[in-house]
Amino acid sequence: MIDTIKVNNKTIPWLYVERGFEIPSFNYVLKTENVDGRSGSIYKGRRLESYSFDIPLVVRNDYLSHNGIKTHDDVLNELVKFFNYEEQVKLQFKSKDWYWNAYFEGPIKLHKEFTIPVKFTIKVVLTDPYKYSVTGNKNTAISDQVSVVNSGTADTPLIVEARAIKSSSYFMITKNDEDYFMVGDDEVTKEVKDYIPPVYHSEFRDFKGWTKMITEDIPSNDLGGKVGGDFVISNLGEGYKATNFPDAKGWVGAGTKRGLPKAMTDFQITYKCIVEQKGKGAGRTAQHIYDSDGKLLASIGYENKYHDRKIGHIVVTLYNQKGDPKKIYDYQNKPIMYNLDRIVVYMRLRRVGNKFSIKTWKFDHIKDPDRRKPIDMDEKEWIDGGKFYQRPASIIAIYSAKYKGYKWMEMNGLGSFNTEILPKPKGARDVIIQKGDLVKIDMQAKSVVINEEPMLSEKSFGSNYFNVDSGYSELIIQPENVFDTTVKWQDRYL
């Protein structure tokens, strides 16, 4: 049987695996110790190690093959494109229903004078020595219990997704009364008090309650500009995209505004946006916060101000009663972000008394569309020593813009989450999970997010990420009758 390989589900039609290749498996290495005066050695244990091997490949290069006769450079260039990855890839034999997470190592050696057929080898490096089933599994909890059947020959990690049908101070999942993972606080002697109620939380799927900004420009050098453009629903119905940009100089864009249901003295405001940075260009998008008099109080947003470079940054600026700006946060993307084509950016501004806290994080939307693995995270605190920025937050606006005369790096708002912070009752437990929140736990990536916010800091001391063994396992969810929970896993093999 002629077989070929798939790399991230891609194949080359004229590339085949040479017959006779032996698939390596079960790479256990024993640890032993010699003892003087004793025959043999003492068994100290075993471990599953990483390993590498060569896959012999054949290039079909005749008139009947795909694209006919190919030159040395034609083949080499296609092979380089096929194998050139810095990160792990899914490596699968087309005839098998499992794959490795693999790296490739050079060199690729092709004979200068092509023969029929052309043979070469590619070195595969497995830092993760397991095989994974191509088909995933999932099961839904019934009465806060969920069964997991791992049909593989090795233990395997889980992905847990739990939607809160009530607010809660914690979420916990246990395995066979052996292992458990918990985020939050379940101390029964503390009363549960929800002192952080949502005031206005919205994903941008419609314009209900919003008013287009026509003449009221946004006086922010960092994140403002000329208004008058329009927003349309974009990103598969989940975002505000600016269109019909006004004819003016400088930053031009679209803005929309609304009042909050109530003014907030202490608050937590999160703005999320998506940035299309596959191509170069300048752009900015922000949420602006106003006081009850309609004066600008704060701006939180993302900007790429270079038309020929992909160097975005997150900016937070405060404004006093006179409108004078005070930039308290300016965080430039780490270099790992520059090569990503599409990113989702979260910015959170929290004010309690005279202390401002900023938390930002991002997701690679191409490789992590479910947003389980936050990257480029940062936090900072700033004290308003003179108490110049204490006015209540009453109105919010969303603004997206490009710079006139230059290519636009498209940036679209995805959502705005505005929460009031009331005085914390003495001895109360924090309600870290609100009704409707989605808790996501990735046991392999060792990440936990609540409503796409990284919450590893809330992981309970003593709990840990765990795998389920080969065969049957029973998982229990706590607290009872609070979460709709689904567990996902892949069978894993030695």
Predicted regions: what they are:
Residues 1-200, 263, 276-297, 417-494:
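Extracellular/virion structural assembly segments
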Residues 151-153, 178-235, 408-411, 420:
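Extracellular carbohydrate-recognition regions
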Residues 207-324, 412:
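Secretory/extracellular carbohydrate-interaction modules
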Residues 257-269, 336-343, 466-468:
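Extracellular/lumenal carbohydrate-interaction signature centered on repeated Trp-anchored short motifs
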Residues 269-271, 336-384, 447-450:
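Carbohydrate-binding surfaces in secreted/extracellular proteins
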Residues 296-306, 345-351, 394-399, 439-442:
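Broad, structure-driven detector of short, well-ordered beta-strand segments within folded domains
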Residues 315-348:
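Short, aromatic/His-centered strand-loop micro-motif at the edge of beta-sheets
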Residues 369-412, 467:
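Flexible glycan-contacting loops in extracellular carbohydrate-active proteins
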